[in-house]
Amino acid sequence: MANIINLWNGIVPTVQDVNVASITAFKSMIDETWDKKIEANTCISRKHRNIIHEVIRDFMKAYPKMDENKKSPLGAPMQWLTQYYILKNEYHKTMLAYDNGSLNTKFKTLNIYMITNVGQYILYIVFCIISGKNHDGTPYIYDSEITSNDKNFINERIKYACKQILHGQLTIALRIRNKFMFIGSPMYLWFNVNGSQVYHDIYDRNAGFHNKEIGRLLYAFMYYLSISGRFLNDFALLKFTYLGESWTFSLSVPEYILYGLGYSVFDTIEKFSNDAILVYIRTNNRNGYDYVEFNKKGIAKVTEDKPDNDKRIHAIRLINDSTDVQHIHFGFRNMVIIDNECANIQSSAENATDTGHHQDSKINIEVEDDVIDDDDYNPKPTPIPEPHPRPPFPRHEYHKRPKLLPVEEPDPVKKDADRIRLDNHILNTLDHNLNFIGHYCCDTAAVDRLEHHIETLGQYAVILARKINMQTLLFPWPLPTVHPHAIDGSIPPHGRSTIL
């Protein structure tokens, strides 16, 4: 609402130049995937998801200045819903005209019942969204309705548009029997829209959609929004804001939620508690993910450079002992992030696993004590500090003893052959408990610092050996090489001239 109020008062944010780079990337993606058949396990790759994500956000960013006599008295975001404003949107105009209008020409040949390829799917859904039109060609909101005071009428029109974009994706999934194709419905289409109503309208009134194996990510997206309202008031733990469009969360926020709504971990995030959150931002070279950790309430801003499209991810895991156990799977590592391998995507509580944390890295930048070493020029010996007894496993303040999930007892009436089978649910419960105990008992940050210091000491031991050899042998001799730091790749100042 802050955005609409600012617009009403004439406070208009500076509209940035059209990001032609995202349009170019979108065109290349469509060309690359135009002939790629959609099969049962086909999904949209991480790189292509991020290109789609950028296109929708850049379209939103380029909305035109709103006329005083063309504003919604209800606060509805008409700049993204009506032809009056969309046709003035410079990004939209550039997209339609790009490459002699080739994308728009292809779009006009498509309809929802003939799409069979990935490129067709992406172009059709994205162009419906940025054109502000339903599948039948009608606009989300007619220009004559911009200033309407009929709250129920406007809310129903926006709700219909929101449902149509999701219903269309499910229709394609059902026809092709596909599990993982998914784009979502952007944040502004949820203006005064109840997620629970959308979920029940789509799944309860369409018998063909009852098979949740079809359109798994779409189902997971709508189910999550059905149990987590947009404005949670006293229950909110996080709030995302982009261009004045806000959304609050009380659960871990999987990547398919942020991606489907159009939010990014690089947006403004406000924390309402001191519970830790892990903000996943990119893949790393250990087949895992890099994350930033925030502990204090207030504004949490990721200051890292935005990664490339093939590496960037958007997901938040809440570390909160009071999280409802019924929904704790939303924070499981392999569900909170969409795997780049289609066959490994997890989207249901029954199959969610919480493994692989050892491959992830916390990347908050902290100043190390040994960045600048002045001790070489200090004639006084380094004082040995007095010992300070501490627990064998120092813990952060927020690491209270975790509440472990109960493990099912064996059923005494089962046959031996049945009892020795390992239930996947029990395995997931044990794995979850193990991860929580590990976080509780081990200060991973302290271990990381210790590893870093040990590696640095090893480098200085080599430097010292070189100096001794040079001063005692007094003639050239094969000297040991000072290799880059195994963790951060740095070379100590005293060893930079020794690299062979």
Curated annotation (Swiss-Prot):
Keyword Membrane in annotation: yes
Q: Organism's domain of life?
A: Viruses
Question: What does the annotation give as the result of altering C441A?
Answer: About 50% loss of interaction with OPG154. Complete loss of interaction with A2
An example GO biological process term is: fusion of virus membrane with host plasma membrane
Using the record, list the residue span of the signal peptide; answer none if the entry has no such feature: none
Say where the protein is mainly found: virion
Cystine pairings recorded for this chain: C43-C342
**Subcellular localization, as worded in the UniProt entry:** Virion membrane
> Which Gene Ontology cellular component terms are annotated?
membrane; viral envelope; virion membrane
This molecule's function is given as: Envelop protein that mediates acid-dependent endocytosis into host cells. Plays an important role in endocytic entry of the virus by acting as an acid-sensitive membrane fusion suppressor. Low pH in host endosomes triggers conformational changes to allow de-repression of viral fusion complex activity and membrane fusion within vesicles. Also plays a role in bridging the mature virion with structural protein OPG152.
- Describe the subunit structure: Interacts with proteins OPG094 and OPG143. Interacts with OPG154. Interacts with OPG152. Interacts with host laminin.
The family note in this entry says:
Belongs to the orthopoxvirus OPG153 protein family.
Its name, as the record gives it, is: Envelop protein OPG153
